């Protein structure tokens, strides 16, 4: 990863943590109907994984009936991704970064307060209509997209997948994938390039807050 790549990723993390316009204009799993139809079409020709996808579809349906489609579950999933990211950051760096972000927030729970505030921004996005997601997941295109993006997450970012998979939250990942991309990219970078490169990224984030 080049210095320019680190700078660009640090900028996106800072913007995600500090500004509301980071999320504005972003696509999401509900509105991108073209992508849903694309995954539906791909599912028809992807005969090699038909058996495994059939099992995954059963998991989707069971998860829906257990109430997975809700804003609270989306917020929980995003919060877990923040937690993975924060586990790799030293206590001193977390204290410095989150105290700068917190503004009027005070007390010993500053980090959790900032994380929850950012998670709610994503979970409460106007276009994240859980009713539409519920019926969409029962249909073909959105269900296929959910399964394929979960599979991609498992391959590209197994640490995040493992954490979300515990409660089937990986099936919701496609809804907010773009919004949390700076965090998942940083987590993946740490796994690929090591803690030294990750710490260098965090130094850049700290200097930009």
Positions of PLM-derived features:
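Membrane-engaging insertion elements
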Residues: 5-51, 75, 128-187
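Charge-rich, solvent-exposed alpha-helical interaction surfaces
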Residues: 9-12, 29, 36, 63, ...
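Organelle targeting or membrane-anchoring low-complexity regions in eukaryotic organelle proteins
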Residues: 10-15, 104-112, 205-209
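Low-complexity, intrinsically disordered, cysteine-poor segments enriched in small/polar
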Residues: 25, 29-36, 40, 77, ...
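Mature extracellular/secreted ectodomains of secretory-pathway proteins
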Residues: 38, 42-107
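Membrane-inserting effector segments that mediate pore formation, membrane fusion
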Residues: 92-149
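C-terminal assembly and membrane-engagement modules of membrane-active proteins
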Residues: 173-209
